[in-house]
């Protein structure tokens, strides 16, 4: 009980950290420095709570915390349930559109671009996610967009993630507009909502590593590195925003639309918090 209270106090302090950072009058604000301070505190929290876990292992979720669960997961990864989805995603990525182009025409580096997303588009003044870029490519070439949460969008995303494994998370926040989006995502992460009056941080910081019913709560650090995921509960592969919607439903809150500004800003914040880790998707989860 005492440790839970201490965790709660610490997460509350993280919420206030940026607002309390002194900014010299009339001086140009170094937004990246403010964000880097958040990252240091956020990652420091988890490294203190789980001193035996290497930083890079947080991308493996609960399997970094529980040895029995890790063994079961490794056995499952020997014959990954998402393997066929990756193959299907590759075919879709290279399939010609009616105009002769393809998704491959829109992405550099042969499609190994997971490390480029999400990013803040300074011209459009909004966060752009990988799934958003996939559908924008299709629409720009006269094709219909994929449905957002599962199916072909998740398969293409899984293929791109698979050929991008090992790329380092390094999301930049350079401007006031980018910082505003980051702060919206941060506020979403720490805000309580729904019938259960819970927050993302309440589950995945204060209760990280503990059991809720029969499940172990995953740590927030590394949450975005391994998506899309094949969840046993779903019986299929799905996107990060599908998982966000599921979390909202679990606490009795109305989900936002997939790829809404709210969820894109949340993804932006969460990915920034994982700066320094490596992308390791797609992955399998319960």
From Swiss-Prot:
Keywords: Disulfide bond, Electron transport, Heme, Iron, Metal-binding, Periplasm, Signal, Transferase, Transport
Designated name of the protein: L-cysteine S-thiosulfotransferase subunit SoxA
Subcellular compartments: Periplasm
Co-factor binding comment: Binds 1 heme group per subunit.
Gene: soxA
pH sensitivity of activity: Optimum pH is 6.0-6.5.
Activity as a function of temperature: Optimum temperature is 55-60 degrees Celsius.
Molecular function GO terms recorded: electron transfer activity; heme binding; iron ion binding; metal ion binding; oxidoreductase activity; oxidoreductase activity, acting on a sulfur group of donors, cytochrome as acceptor; protein heterodimerization activity; thiosulfate-cyanide sulfurtransferase activity
Source species: Chlorobaculum tepidum (strain ATCC 49652 / DSM 12025 / NBRC 103806 / TLS)
